[in-house]
Amino acid sequence: MANPWWTNQSGLAGMVDHSVSSGHHQNHHHQSLLTKGDLGIAMNQSQDNDQDEEDDPREGAVEVVNRRPRGRPPGSKNKPKAPIFVTRDSPNALRSHVLEISDGSDVADTIAHFSRRRQRGVCVLSGTGSVANVTLRQAAAPGGVVSLQGRFEILSLTGAFLPGPSPPGSTGLTVYLAGVQGQVVGGSVVGPLLAIGSVMVIAATFSNATYERLPMEEEEDGGGSRQIHGGGDSPPRIGSNLPDLSGMAGPGYNMPPHLIPNGAGQLGHEPYTWVHARPPY
C-alpha cells in the first residue's frame, strides 16, 4: 500500500543529506584557509610598514652622514721640502754693517782701511757720536778749508769708499756737526776726524761697481754698462780690465791716466776691478 504524502515529507525531514553537509564542510574549510592566508599577508605588510617607518628619519632626529673630508688626504702631495741653505753670497748683494770706531781713531781713515782690507766698497749711511779737531772744505770759507777745534756732535754722516782706483770725489765723507753752543757746521771731510768715545757708523758694503758718465751718448744707449763680478773663485786682477790712457787727461775731471778709457777723451762705462777676499764669519 502506498504511503501517504505526508509520510514522505516526514521521512525527508528526518533524513540527513550527506552531500549537502560535506559541501558545507568543504566551503567552511576553504574559508578558514583564505582567512589564514589573508592574515599572513596582512602581518607581512604590517611588518614591512614597521620596517619602513623605522628606516625613515623621525621628526627631530639627527641624521649622521659619513662624508669624505675636503682636501687631499695627508701625505698625498705637498710634502715638506728640504730647507735650502745658501752658502755663498750673491755678488750683487749688499751687506749691512754696524761699525764701532774706538776712541781717538780717525773716522775717515778707519773706514777707508776697512774698505781696502775687505776689498769691498763701503756706503756710509749714518753715524752717531762725538768728534774733535775737524777740518772741512767749505766753499764760503777763505781758501775753501776751515779747521774747527773742540768737541762736536755728529748730526749726519754720509759718504762712500772704494777699495781700488776711483775718480776724485767718489770717495770721502760729508758730515754735519753741532757745536757746544748750538752752532751747526758741515762740509766735506778733508782732514782728521778724531772720535771722542765710541762712534757708531751704519754702512752697507758691495762688491761690484760700474762707472757711468751722464748724460749718455746716443750710440751708448743700447750698449749697456759693463760690470765686474767679484767674490768668485778666481777674481780678476786689479787694473787688468782698465784701458791704457797714456797721454790723455780730462781737464774737467783731473782723472789719473789709468782711469781715462781708450784715449777717447770721454769717460765711458768702465768697471772697477777689486780682488774680493772671502770675509771671515
Curated annotation (Swiss-Prot):
Quote the subcellular location field of this record: Nucleus
Region Disordered: list its residue ranges.
43-85, 216-247
Transmembrane region(s): none
InterPro entries in the cross-refs: AHL15-29, PPC_dom
Identify the DNA-binding region of this protein by residue numbers: 67-79
**Keywords for this protein:** DNA-binding, Immunity, Innate immunity, Nucleus, Plant defense, Transcription, Transcription regulation
CDD domains named in the record: DUF296 (cd11378)
Predominant location: nucleus
Q: From the UniProt record, which GO molecular function terms apply?
A: minor groove of adenine-thymine-rich DNA binding
This protein's GO CC annotations:
nucleus
Which Gene3D superfamilies has this protein been placed in?
Hypothetical protein, similar to alpha- acetolactate decarboxylase, domain 2 (3.30.1330.80)
Q: Which GO terms describe its biological process?
A: defense response to bacterium; innate immune response; negative regulation of defense response to bacterium; negative regulation of innate immune response; regulation of photoperiodism, flowering
Question: Residues in domain PPC?
Answer: 91-229
Q: What does this protein do?
A: Transcription factor that specifically binds AT-rich DNA sequences related to the nuclear matrix attachment regions (MARs). Negatively regulates plant innate immunity (PTI) to pathogens through the down-regulation of the PAMP-triggered NHO1 and FRK1 expression.
The entry's free-text remark on domains says: The PPC domain mediates interactions between AHL proteins.
Q: PANTHER family per the record?
A: AT-HOOK MOTIF NUCLEAR-LOCALIZED PROTEIN 15, AT-HOOK MOTIF NUCLEAR-LOCALIZED PROTEIN 20
Note in the entry: Overexpression of AHL20 results in a decreased expression of NHO1 and FRK1 and in an enhanced susceptibility to virulent strain DC3000.
Task: Please state what the protein is called.
Answer: AT-hook motif nuclear-localized protein 20
Taxonomic lineage from the root: Eukaryota, Viridiplantae, Streptophyta, Embryophyta, Tracheophyta
The gene coding this protein: AHL20
